[in-house]
């Protein structure tokens, strides 16, 4: 076993102070690396009170390189200033302390910290490992930041793709895009992010409930999910819905529930505990993921771990479809039309217990590659190569 690697993990957020797939990945990665005897430093922005110690394995050295800052606008988009501040903080830290590290492991987005690490790499002689959860298309950049801003964003992304690095992607979609952006070298595909126990799930009969779980931002298209549930409820007696999560689209969610007259059968309680999410996943007819943009689609794996199928909407920026085998662990709606999504929900309903059995079997067959441990082993192999 490779031991004693000095690793600097770089991410501007830390779970559970902010919640998301990237936050979970870097916390899990850091804690597993520390548990295996590696020397881990975690660079981040401060997200807790002054003088407090963050809730993290004490073997991990947490260094804040920037102050506490709001990361998102009211509409749910990333603010520009925090990534700039974080990038500068990372640059200054690595300028002073970079020689102590053998590997700097960073997320590609929001880019400036990666550029800082890449700029100092020739001087400080560490290896740079980069996780690309997503590679945005030019059209998505324009939608997100407008014409000029989108052009600048796409150019910065292209620059980041071309710096020397050991690149990791979590889907074929984004691996192919990264190569197209001009990456020099190979892309390592990491398929496993699931950190919970990998026991084979025991299927149970579903309740007539569609579950939505995620941050309520425009990309998740939560009002589209409500419309689809309303249409499916016309054909499935007693069908309801549970929408777990919070965010800037919560007001729109409540309005959509009222507009479709679903107040008695659809609930939207906001942020939920892990225990509540687990219970809802186990009983749900399906997990509904109407997102138009996903770098991975973790909720599909989490649902399958409980023998619950998923319904996912196809789209050019949605990598979650890679986790779906239609008719086995869920269904794919070909378009973002509410009727197409409702039809997919109906197909899951018609699949009955047999589809829940096949979903559990799918999870068991893919458990090894879907596990965090499999990705960790791949990452460690890359570290060993860097040390050699």
Residue ranges of model-derived segments:
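Short beta-strand->alpha-helix junction loop in the catalytic core
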Residues: 136, 173-174, 181-183, 190-200, ...
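Conserved donor-binding/catalytic core segment of Leloir-type glycosyltransferases
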Residues: 168, 202-229
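Aromatic "clamp/platform" in nucleotide-sugar-dependent glycosyltransferases that forms part
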Residues: 292
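A charged, aromatic-enriched C-terminal amphipathic alpha-helix characteristic of glycosyltransferases
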Residues: 352-384
């Amino acid at each position: 076993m490779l031991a004693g690697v000095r690793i600097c993990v770089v991410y501007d957020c830390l779970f559970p102070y902010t919640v998301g797939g990237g936050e979970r990945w870097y916390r899990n990665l850091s804690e597993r690396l520390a548990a295996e005897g590696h020397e881990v430093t975690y660079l981040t922005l401060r997200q807790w009170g002054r003088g407090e110690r963050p809730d993290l394995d004490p073997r991990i050295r947490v260094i804040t390189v920037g102050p506490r800052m709001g990361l998102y606008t009211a509409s749910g988009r990333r603010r520009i200033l925090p990534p700039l501040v974080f990038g500068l903080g990372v640059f200054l830290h690595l300028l002073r302390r970079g020689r102590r590290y053998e590997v700097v492991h960073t997320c590609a987005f929001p880019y400036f910290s990666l550029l800082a690490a890449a700029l100092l790499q020739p001087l400080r002689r560490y290896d740079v490992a980069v996780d690309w959860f997503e590679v945005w298309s030019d059209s998505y950049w324009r939608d997100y930041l407008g014409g000029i801003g989108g052009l600048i964003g796409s150019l910065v992304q292209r620059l980041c793709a071309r710096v020397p690095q050991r690149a990791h992607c979590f889907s074929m979609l984004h691996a192919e895009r990264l190569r197209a952006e001009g990456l020099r070298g190979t892309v390592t595909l990491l398929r496993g992010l699931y950190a919970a126990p990998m026991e084979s799930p025991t299927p149970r009969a579903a309740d007539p409930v569609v579950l939505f779980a995620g941050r309520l931002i425009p990309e998740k298209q939560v009002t589209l999910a409500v419309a689809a549930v309303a249409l499916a409820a016309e054909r499935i007696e007693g069908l309801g819905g549970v929408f777990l999560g919070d965010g800037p689209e919560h007001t729109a969610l409540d309005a959509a529930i009222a507009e479709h007259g679903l107040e008695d059968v659809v609930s939207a309680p906001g942020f939920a505990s892990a225990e509540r999410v687990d219970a809802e996943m186990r009983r749900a007819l399906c997990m509904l993921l109407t997102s138009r943009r996903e770098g991975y689609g973790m909720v599909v794996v989490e649902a399958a771990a409980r023998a619950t199928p998923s319904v996912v909407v196809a789209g050019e920026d949605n990598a979650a479809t890679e986790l779906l085998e239609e008719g086995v662990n869920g269904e794919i709606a070909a378009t973002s039309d509410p009727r197409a999504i409702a039809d997919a929900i109906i197909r899951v309903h018609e699949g009955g217990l047999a589809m829940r059995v096949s979903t559990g079997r799918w999870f068991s067959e893919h458990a090894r590659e879907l596990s965090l441990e499999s990705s960790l082993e791949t990452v460690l192999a890359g570290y060993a190569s860097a040390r050699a």
